[in-house]
């Protein structure tokens, strides 16, 4: 008996597929499910009354109608539950894909020139794609631009492209990015990666082609002069993050990929650490063999004792400031007058601190003892009573006898 083919389709309106029958004229259900996974039977439309009629199924075997298979188109039957689940899955996937494609956000444009209008902004960004909204923020009182604005595109791919580069608008470089709604301490996900251990024969185009296999590359930067590393920027931050920590082979050389730390993170750390990062040099100095009544002491007078003291604990100074202070002390006494004035405002001073302070050794100090053979007028530093020995006698005579200066307690 010659093999017969019957026409089977998933839907009446679709193009049918021919399926072979067995020698006895029956069709195995396994033959149908091989072409239509999940199928559980066949049905056809009765030519007489146009009603759908099912094909008899016995133990996995489909039997032909009374008049044979004929030239009819047989439609595949699916279990209702499976059909419903498949439809829901397809609909859900379609919605997710649609949302992913159409989701766009307002982008903030920073650094706009004062003269830029909303029409100027729209004309510029229209070169990238369809613009559905532009706004230049203005001062409510003056009506002048605040130097930033917002733009929204109709297409998500256009938005990604615009965010991946800087823009020259009316003669000024501007940045276009998503408004940062995160807290200052929360790190932003970077789309840029650092590629270390590069060789000089690796060009920017070769790096672009290599990394394009992982995702869309929007920029490749190799610093000049060559320093054995490069930066690669992706359109998607997830691609960049997935490559961080990987060792990749480019032109037979192993390169290491890590996160490119944004500059603003370093600035933020500097702000947390203070203006001068590093250990504080307040309460530190050059120890000497004898105690001092203050961290920075200066005792001057014509055969006068005592000492005027000044504590540097209130000042957080670094080595550069310390060196500058030392140079100023050696070259001019004007610096001492300034420090004395600051002492009177911020720190304790006394005319006779010697007894109490001499009993404890403070290793962080500067001391300077100067004697001049002069009894001329005093530029007062310390107590008004010069007899107490706590003063700064600034009279200089031609018959200077001696000067002893030392850094000590």
From Swiss-Prot:
- Domain RRM intervals: 105-200, 191-262
Residue ranges, compositional bias (Basic and acidic residues): 261-274
**Keyword Transmembrane helix assigned:** no
**What are the alphabetically sorted keywords of the record?**
Biological rhythms, Cytoplasm, DNA-binding, Mitochondrion, mRNA processing, mRNA splicing, Nucleus, Repeat, Repressor, RNA-binding, Transcription, Transcription regulation
Q: Name one GO biological process term.
A: regulation of circadian rhythm
Primary subcellular site in the record, as a coarse category: nucleus
Domain writeup: The RRM domains can bind to both DNA and RNA.
The protein's role, per its UniProt record:
Probably involved in transcriptional repression. May play a role in the maintenance of the circadian clock periodicity.
This protein's name: TAR DNA-binding protein 43
Q: Which organism is it from?
A: Xenopus tropicalis
């Amino acid at each position: 008996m010659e093999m017969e083919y019957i026409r089977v389709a998933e839907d009446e309106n679709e193009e049918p597929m021919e399926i072979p029958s067995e020698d006895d004229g029956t069709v195995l259900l396994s033959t149908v499910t091989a072409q239509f996974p999940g199928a559980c039977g066949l049905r056809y439309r009765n030519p007489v009354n146009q009603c759908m009629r099912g094909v008899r199924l016995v133990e996995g075997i489909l039997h032909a109608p009374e008049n044979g298979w004929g030239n009819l188109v047989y439609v595949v039957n699916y279990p209702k539950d499976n059909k419903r689940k498949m439809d829901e899955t397809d609909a859900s996937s379609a919605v997710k894909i649609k949302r992913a494609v159409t989701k766009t956000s307002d982008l903030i444009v920073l650094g706009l020139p004062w003269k830029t209008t909303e029409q100027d902004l729209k004309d510029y960004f229209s070169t990238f794609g369809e613009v559905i909204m532009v706004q230049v923020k203005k001062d409510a009182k003056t009506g002048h631009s605040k130097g930033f604005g917002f733009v929204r595109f109709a297409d998500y791919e256009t938005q990604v492209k615009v965010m991946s580069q800087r823009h020259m608008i009316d003669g000024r470089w501007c940045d276009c990015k998503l408004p940062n709604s995160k807290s200052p301490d929360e790190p932003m996900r970077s789309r840029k990666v650092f590629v270390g251990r590069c060789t000089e024969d690796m060009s920017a185009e070769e790096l672009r082609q290599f990394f394009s296999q992982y995702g869309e590359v929007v920029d490749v930067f190799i610093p000049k002069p060559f320093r054995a590393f490069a930066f690669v920027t992706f359109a998607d931050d997830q691609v960049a993050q997935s490559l961080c920590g990987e060792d990749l082979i480019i032109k037979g050389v192993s390169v290491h990929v890590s996160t490119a730390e944004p500059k603003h993170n370093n600035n933020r750390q500097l702000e947390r650490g203070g203006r001068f990062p590093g250990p504080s040099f307040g309460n530190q100095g050059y120890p000497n063999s004898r105690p001092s009544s203050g961290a920075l002491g200066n005792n001057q007078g014509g055969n006068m004792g005592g000492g005027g003291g000044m504590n540097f604990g209130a000042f957080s100074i670094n080595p550069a400031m310390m060196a500058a202070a030392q140079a100023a002390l050696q070259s001019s006494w004007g610096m001492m007058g300034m420090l004395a004035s600051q002492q009177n405002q911020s720190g304790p001073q006394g005319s006779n601190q010697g007894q109490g302070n001499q009993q404890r050794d403070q290793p962080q100090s500067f001391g300077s003892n100067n004697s001049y053979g002069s009894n001329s007028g005093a530029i007062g530093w310390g107590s008004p009573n010069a007899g107490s020995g706590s003063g700064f006698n600034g009279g200089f005579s031609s018959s200077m006898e001696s000067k002893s200066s030392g850094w000590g307690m």
